[in-house]
């Protein structure tokens, strides 16, 4: 091995160790916070399960060879809580409901960061089975959107029997891709937003009458390192602005009798489908990208979702740890 390649190998090994240590530190802090936070009595069993998973994840993350196992345990921290919290069905606006929202938002925000660190560690360890955190250097946004639309239309065909048409429109100065760095996790909010729009069309008129509605429109632009995507559908929209806001709150919009859907074969879906998790998780991913997700629309007409994000790759978490801690304490 040449001296240059050996130097690069050592740099990668050092960076992998840094990622592993950062993941261990995050999981240690998470376990400590879950053990110390005061919650209503009815939430104590949920907290105890989450704290136990966090402690196990912390122990696994302390050893480089078991980082992948640590991530699996980190998934359980939030995953175990969802069905338990769902059963509480607290009235919207109550103190317990507010605490549940804060608990889920904090847990899944931590989980997104854990996933990114674990994935980066695997990349630096040269694990060939791990996809890159970056979609592709200088990849045009329209290529990412075309891929997301194709995948989501495949999902809609499998679930409903047919998929709505989608028009992809470039808006503004979107021709330059120089310096563009799109993280792979932008795909998640795109899929969730497109999936909701396609589902609203199918539920409004039926899969066999989708041609009676105008196509879904996806507009996009990139300018000065900032990306914007707007998805507009004709699926009926929300009855009021408050309903649009509520749709991005955990566990609020789901039917309590509806079971999770595990059937989509391309695997980009989530085990939380059917639990009222899609849009809240999409919003957290948008914040992790340094942006925001906004929902609006005309009652009886359609919905409009606007996703803004940093397209330079410089942002990791839109909220610093101090801000997250303040949110958690207020809960």
Regions found by a protein language model. Name each.
Residues 165-177:
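Conserved catalytic submotifs in the C-terminal HATPase_c
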Residues 152, 182-214, 222-223, 280-288:
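Conserved ATP-binding N-box helix of the HATPase_c
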Residues 2-165, 179, 183-187:
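Signal-transmission coiled-coils
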Residues 181-185, 231-233, 242-245, 308, ...:
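Short coil/turn segments at secondary-structure boundaries
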Residues 232-239, 251:
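Glycine-rich acidic phosphate-binding loop
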Residues 240-247, 258-259:
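Short adenine-binding "F-helix/F-box" segment of the Bergerat
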Residues 159-162, 177-178, 196-234, 261:
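ATP-lid-like helix-loop hinge signature
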Residues 2-15, 31, 35-38, 252-331:
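Flexible, glycine-/charge-rich segments associated with ATP-binding catalytic modules
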């Amino acid at each position: 091995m040449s001296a240059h390649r050996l130097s690069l190998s050592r740099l990668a090994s050092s960076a992998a160790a840094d990622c592993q240590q950062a993941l261990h530190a995050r999981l240690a802090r998470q376990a400590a916070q879950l053990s110390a936070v005061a919650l209503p009595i009815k939430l104590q069993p949920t907290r105890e399960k989450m704290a136990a998973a966090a402690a196990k994840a912390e122990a696994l993350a302390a050893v480089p060879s078991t980082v992948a196992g640590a991530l699996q345990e980190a998934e359980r921290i939030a995953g175990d809580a969802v069905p338990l919290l769902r059963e509480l069905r607290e009235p919207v606006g109550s103190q317990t409901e507010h605490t549940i929202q804060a608990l889920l938002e904090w847990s899944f925000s931590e989980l997104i960061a854990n996933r990114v660190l674990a994935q980066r560690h695997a990349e630096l360890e040269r694990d060939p089975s791990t996809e890159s955190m970056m979609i592709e250097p200088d990849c045009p946004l329209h290529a990412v959107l075309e891929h997301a639309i194709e995948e989501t239309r495949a999902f809609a065909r499998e679930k409903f029997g047919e998929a709505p048409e989608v028009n992809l429109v470039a808006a503004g100065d979107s021709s330059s891709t120089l310096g563009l760095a799109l993280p792979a996790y932008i795909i998640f909010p795109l899929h969730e937003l497109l999936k909701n729009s396609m589902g609203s069309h199918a539920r409004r008129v039926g899969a066999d009458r989708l041609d009676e509605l105008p196509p879904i429109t996806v507009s996009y632009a990139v300018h000065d390192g900032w990306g914007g995507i707007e998805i507009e559908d004709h699926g009926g929209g929300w009855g009021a602005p408050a309903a649009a806001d509520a749709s991005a709150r955990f566990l609020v919009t789901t039917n309590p009798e509806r079971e999770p859907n595990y059937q989509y074969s391309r695997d980009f879906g989530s085990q939380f489908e059917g639990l009222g998790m899609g849009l809240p998780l999409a919003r957290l991913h948008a914040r992790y990208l340094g942006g925001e997700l906004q929902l609006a629309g005309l009652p009886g007409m359609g919905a409009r979702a606007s996703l803004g994000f940093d397209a330079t790759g410089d942002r990791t978490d839109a909220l610093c740890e101090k801000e997250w801690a303040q949110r958690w304490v207020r809960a």
